[in-house]
């Protein structure tokens, strides 16, 4: 099983913010463990190692194109991909494109049922997105999400949520070009989320 293959990365330099992989320099991690670290903890080294397994950023972009997303592109690795330089098309997407892609991944036939459920489980277990949409979620609502942050005030989240315990609604929010602090950006996204939920 490829997901149980163990990667040893003692000689591979860790990149900034790698809270899980930095603890496994001697014993390594499986692909499954790297996926969990990248999604639930936003571990940057885990993301880079996973990119390596599929052939790098260009292969991820090709995969997205093959599933119909001709907008989203990944050109670089962590942490350089977070630069968010104005008018730079590298490492970018658009909310509508990402919403469609997320819906296909979570509810379409692109992945097997088991893989879809595993992805949802990892996103549901997200440990670093608490101050964002989760803080505005009504009691009993389901949420599976993945947040991100970058330079120049960039902050974002993609989420599947719903009142029925299922990922029935897709939300994608991106902000950039802001002087706001991280806490302020988190509150802004939470407020946008609260407004969306109020109108559903």
Model features per residue range: what roles?
Residues 6-8, 49, 170-172:
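Soluble periplasmic/extracytoplasmic beta-strand elements of cell-envelope proteins
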Residues 2-4, 64-69, 88, 93, ...:
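Extracytoplasmic
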Residues 38, 64, 171:
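Terminal peptide-recognition signature
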Residues 10-12, 39-42, 53-54, 76-79, ...:
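Active-site-proximal beta-strand/loop segments in catalytic clefts of secreted hydrolases
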Residues 22, 53, 100-131, 136-142, ...:
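Structured C-terminal helix/loop/strand segments within mature extracytoplasmic catalytic/sensor domains
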Residues 1-13, 57, 61, 112-115:
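Short, well-structured active-site flanking segments
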Residues 30, 48-107:
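Mid-domain, small-residue-enriched loop/turn segments at the edges of structured enzyme/sensor domains
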Residues 14-49, 57:
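Conserved catalytic neighborhood of penicillin-recognizing serine enzymes
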């Amino acid at each position: 099983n490829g997901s149980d293959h163990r990667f040893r990365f003692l000689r591979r330099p860790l990149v900034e913010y790698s809270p899980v992989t930095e603890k496994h320099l001697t014993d390594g991690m499986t692909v499954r463990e790297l996926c969990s670290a990248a999604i639930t903890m936003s571990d940057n080294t885990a993301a880079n190692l996973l990119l390596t397994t599929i052939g790098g950023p260009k292969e991820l972009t090709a995969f997205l194109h093959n599933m119909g997303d001709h907008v989203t592109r990944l050109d670089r690795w962590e942490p350089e991909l977070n630069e968010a330089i104005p008018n730079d098309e590298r490492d970018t997407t658009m909310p509508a494109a990402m919403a469609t892609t997320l819906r296909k991944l979570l509810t379409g036939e692109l992945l097997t049922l088991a893989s879809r459920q595993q992805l949802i489980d990892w996103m549901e277990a997200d440990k670093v997105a608490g101050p964002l949409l989760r803080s505005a979620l009504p009691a009993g609502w389901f949420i599976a999400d993945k947040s991100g942050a970058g330079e120049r005030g960039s902050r974002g989240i993609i989420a599947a949520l719903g009142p029925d315990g299922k990922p029935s609604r897709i939300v994608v929010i991106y902000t950039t070009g802001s002087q706001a602090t991280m806490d302020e950006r988190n509150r802004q996204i939470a407020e946008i989320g609260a407004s969306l939920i109020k109108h559903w």
